């Protein structure tokens, strides 16, 4: 069964669970993120495929199937954003909650080296990585850590002093 979802952004930078979404049957799997005056200056980051989005990422996203739809977390809010390409795959890094002294360029350079080593190891035969793009979503908090890997993204938490 195909599913589509519509989500109006709330007044906080968090993703509402699927239970909070208003879903209706469609011919494709989709998620629509609607901006509002409360989301002025916010951006969206997700591993979902953008179908029709504005400059900040609000709009319509699609997924090939339901499993992909529910395995792509969404980050909404004010955050730093940077990118690099490894093995022909664009990688994006978004960081929410970092101090103004945060060194984004160093984080990108270090992460790029790790991704280059991983792709060289797992794809030494020259095969392409299994994703079209990859998104790192890092939430910086006072004192915590953790993360969860997804199909083409990862949702991470770290303490401010770790940056």
Regions found by a protein language model. Give the residues of each.
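Extended, low-hydrophobicity, Ser/Thr/Pro/Gly-biased non-transmembrane segments
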Residues: 1-75
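Juxtacatalytic substrate-recognition/specificity segment
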Residues: 83-163
